[in-house]
């Protein structure tokens, strides 16, 4: 087959003419392209890309254990999956960083192998959620796509190379950054060619083959053939530079992660194992559950499932996720950062209603979700079905607090009537306060149990008091634990800034002791105090006394405790008596 010649004209007028002819054929009518008359610049930029190709190094230094600890805050179970994903992803990007740091001093390996990842597991167990969390944490460009939306070039559907172009957009047109991104393709099992299906095989196999080179290493042209926008960009670039712009992305460092439910793969594995075992061993194979069989997956099983051997060969890392039990679903609901409860809190918060769930209620929701047999997705359905009537009625009444109890889930209509009766307001208020106290204690314990990680991450010493304050702030505001800790850290830093302001404005060196900082954090969080208010009180309550001591003794450094802030007169009298008399 002869290689196509590049017939794109270099003359702007010819480009303009061809673009006009293309648009006429495409849209009909007389379409005329009018471009500004701009002469090419005197200097030529041979091969210079139209998009940015920054030389900044990738800033990645996360260790696998750090990423696992982060995922543990959001994902229940999946210990093996979190380990595999964290290790291989961190190694991939740290290897890129190390290579860029070494520069030319590190020779490139011929036949470099990427650790592309294949994730297998039933629907609703958190495959997509895991990858989204990782992408958010590591901060590299990330693109997610559905395998069923793509086709081999020439068939109906998206071109797989569009994924690379989308990655460049996510990187704000920084090609070098895009070359260190992640492409995640879900429902990859849907492009496996099935022996029992006739007709769709060519397209499915074609998509697999189209992915082969990008998954390994290839250069992808960002310009799309026969695309009017690309042609206009070509014209604009030529008019500015006098040269054709090269817009090429190399995929050697782009990590591909694919996932699927693979619902029929267990049967393929069972047949293979049955052939290898006869008699009693064969009966044991038949009794194995689907998830147990998936953990025995081999390359030949995936080939028999309908994948090309070359395609599977480019996915050397396999990650099998566990199915979720009823207890796992309950644990998900108990996690502070779980999106199911946070989302429902946001729903009611939109009407200025604070909602809280008792432990018994969460267990019932988990049981109902497990019966749905759709994994963690069943949690959303169970909560929506249980609370829809309350979400409809409560916004129309003057009610600002709502507690989801076991009784409410078992008798929603009766409880709704009881809840709306004004005579029962105090009863439900007490139920809410009790549930809030229990939830706050649970969150505080969670923070305290993980305070070593949180303290390092936020640069904040977490005493029991600060754990309690963070927990209360989290309970009263819809946010993740990390955001609540960031708020406490921000307030803590603003208090330390007050010390600097006092020194700068009044030439007094005051130092807040830890209990004083905790007291001030509480004022900021619960009473909306401001830096200026605190600064003014420091001047009004302490300046004259501190200034007197400084004039008499030369001392200009003073420590303020919580008691000193609460009872400034007693504190100053004792201090003056001690320092002067």
Report each predicted region and the residues it spans.
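Non-catalytic accessory segments flanking P-loop/AAA+ NTPase cores
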Residues: 1-581
């Amino acid at each position: 087959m002869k290689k196509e010649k590049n017939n794109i004209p270099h003359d702007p007028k010819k480009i303009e003419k061809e673009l006009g002819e293309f648009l006429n054929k495409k849209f009909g009518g007389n379409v005329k392209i009018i471009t500004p008359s701009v002469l090419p610049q005197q200097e030529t930029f041979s091969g210079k890309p139209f998009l940015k190709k920054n030389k900044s190094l990738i800033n990645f230094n996360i260790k696998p254990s750090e990423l696992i600890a982060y995922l543990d805050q959001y994902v229940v179970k999946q210990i093996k999956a979190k380990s595999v994903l964290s290790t291989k992803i961190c190694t991939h990007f740290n290897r890129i960083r190390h290579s860029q740091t070494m520069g030319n001093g590190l020779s490139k390996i011929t036949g470099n192998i990427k650790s592309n990842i294949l994730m297998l597991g039933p629907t609703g167990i958190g495959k997509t959620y895991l990858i989204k969390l990782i992408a958010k944490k590591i901060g590299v460009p990330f693109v997610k796509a559905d395998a069923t939306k793509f086709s081999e070039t020439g068939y109906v559907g998206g071109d797989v190379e569009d994924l690379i172009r989308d990655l460049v957009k996510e990187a704000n047109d920084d090609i070098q950054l895009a070359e260190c991104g992640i492409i995640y393709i879900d429902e990859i099992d849907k492009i496996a060619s099935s022996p029992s299906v006739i007709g769709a095989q060519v397209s499915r196999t074609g998509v697999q083959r189209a992915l082969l080179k990008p998954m390994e290493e290839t250069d992808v042209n960002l310009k799309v053939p026969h695309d009017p926008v690309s042609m206009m960009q070509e014209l604009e670039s030529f008019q500015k530079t006098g040269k054709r712009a090269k817009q090429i992305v190399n995929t050697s460092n782009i990590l591909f992660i694919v996932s699927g439910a693979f619902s029929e793969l267990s049967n393929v594995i069972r047949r293979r194992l049955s052939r290898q075992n006869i008699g009693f061993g064969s009966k044991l194979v038949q009794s194995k559950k689907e998830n147990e069989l998936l953990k025995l997956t081999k390359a030949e099983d995936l080939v028999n499932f309908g994948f090309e051997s070359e395609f599977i060969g480019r996915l050397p890392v396999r990650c099998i996720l566990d199915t979720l039990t009823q207890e796992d679903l309950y644990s998900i609901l108990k996690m502070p950062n779980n999106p199911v409860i946070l989302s429902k809190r946001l729903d009611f918060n939109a009407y200025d209603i604070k909602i809280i769930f008792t432990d018994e209620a969460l267990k019932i929701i988990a049981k109902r979700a497990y019966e749905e047999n759709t994994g963690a997705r069943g949690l959303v359905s169970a909560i929506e079905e249980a609370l829809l009537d309350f979400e409809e009625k409560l916004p129309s009444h003057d009610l600002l607090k709502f507690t989801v109890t076991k009784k409410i889930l078992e008798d929603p209509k009766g409880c709704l009537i009881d809840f709306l009766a004004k005579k029962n307001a105090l009863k439900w208020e007490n139920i809410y306060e009790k549930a809030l106290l229990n939830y706050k204690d649970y969150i505080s314990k969670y923070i305290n149990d993980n305070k070593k990680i949180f303290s390092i991450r936020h640069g904040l010493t977490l005493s029991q008091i600060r754990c309690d304050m963070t927990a209360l702030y989290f309970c009263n505001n819809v946010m993740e634990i990390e955001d609540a800790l960031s708020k406490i850290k921000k307030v803590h830093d603003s208090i330390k800034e007050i010390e600097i302001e006092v020194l700068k404005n009044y030439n007094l060196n005051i130092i807040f002791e830890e209990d004083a900082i905790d007291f001030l954090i509480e004022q900021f969080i619960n009473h909306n105090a401001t830096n200026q208010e605190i600064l003014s009180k420091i001047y009004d309550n302490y300046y004259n006394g501190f200034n007197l001591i400084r004039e008499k003794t030369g001392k200009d450094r003073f420590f303020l405790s919580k008691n000193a802030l609460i009872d400034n007169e007693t504190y100053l009298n004792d201090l003056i008596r001690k320092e002067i008399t």
